[in-house]
Amino acid sequence: MNDERSFRKAQTKFILSSAIVYAFFYLTRKNLSMAQPGMLEEGVISTYAIGTMLSIHGIVYGLSRFVNGFWADRLNGRVFMTVGIALSALMNLLFGCTSLSILFAVFWVLNGWTQGMGFPPCAKMLTHWIHPKELATKMSLWNTSHSFGAVLALGLCSYLLHIGLGWRWCFIVPGALAALIAVFCFFCVKDSPAEAGVEELEIEGGKKEAESKATVTSSERRRLVFGNRVIWLIALANFFVYIVRFGFLDWGPTFLKQFKGIPVAKGGLMTIAFELAAVVGTIFAGWVTDKWFKGRGVRTCVFCMLFAALFSFGFWYLPSGAPIWQATLLLMGAGFCIYGPQALIGIIAANQATKEAAAMANGFTGIMGYLSTLVSGIGVAFIKTHYGWGAALCSFAVFALVGMMLFLCAWNSKATGYKK
């Protein structure tokens, strides 16, 4: 009983501490969306340049998650994560202090690589701390760090802009805060129950941590990931999930100002509402997966993507003169739905690949997700320039439906890849 109590206490501490650190990864990459309108107004960068920068950043981030997924399965997750957030802090500070367009691109692309050092170690550590039967619920709770990080970025940057500090401070202040969080990460996050000094988690059909490190080869890890049909399907679906998600998140304040005539500060608050609804949607999706679908997250994702398409279509159809509260509700509905699949894909991948290859599986699904920035970045910029924001918003609904169809193809898959 005492051992179980000690484990639960250490588990809770790990979930909270790692979630706090990951929220600051989000702070140091989603701050750009609030700085964009100011940068465009000053003329230091163009819409196409921002779109291109977002696309390249996303691709580099996806590659980083994929490559670092291999390393994170082998190295200490706490140290790996600490180095990542420290380097991201540095890139933000450098970005805020430059005025050259080429350096904007260089620092933000490098930030994309350092950002990819955040989730792979978390995916690995979470599977060592949480039993597969609880993973959907508890990892969904952990996954709200994405939304809280985005809310922190939007709220903090809205405040900095409101008091007249200018867009540069949207990078300098988050960079300084992230540097402090790197110290917190090194001392407070624990890689595994063994590092925290508590009993190791036992999983039926799984291996002890020491045994896993000693016996699982690179080829076996690759087989667990690339030989699994479900992982391929959810990776492809993730491409479309992220188009919709980043379409709203990266361009939200900009299209609200240009398409709906809503000031940047109010647009930032509306995007915060989008993220807060995402927190509830993420937790609800995890609970539904464990309680209703017995761990089969792809079934939850099917319904989430269907309703995400409906809310995206509704936002496009809403007249320009409609009250702000109607636009806010539709944004919140889209956020509630789209973040469920975003969280569950990582959980499904970890369960399907087992804890022996969880980081590699999440690296693979991650790179597929962030290849979507070719569409959500420069693609959206192209559609907006030639056809207007209405066409761009309508396309989000179409992409959501394509993602839903891919999840449907995995409807009958088992909940995990562990051998019974």
Predicted regions and their residues:
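Extracytoplasmic gate region of multi-pass secondary transporters
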Residues: 32-36, 228-283, 342, 376-377
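Helix-to-loop junctions at the C-terminal end of transmembrane segments
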Residues: 65-76, 283-294, 384
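Conserved MFS/SLC helix-loop-helix module at the cytosolic interface between two early adjacent transmembrane helices
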Residues: 63-102
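Helix-loop-helix hairpin linking two adjacent transmembrane segments in secondary transporters
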Residues: 142-193
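Residue-level signature of mid-helix packing/kink "hotspots" within the transmembrane helices
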Residues: 30, 58-66, 150-151, 275-283, ...
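Cytoplasmic membrane-interface "Motif A"-like loop-to-helix N-cap segments
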Residues: 74-85, 291-305
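Cytoplasmic helix-loop-helix junction between adjacent transmembrane helices
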Residues: 107-148
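C-terminal ends and interior cores of transmembrane alpha-helices
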Residues: 86-99, 306-320
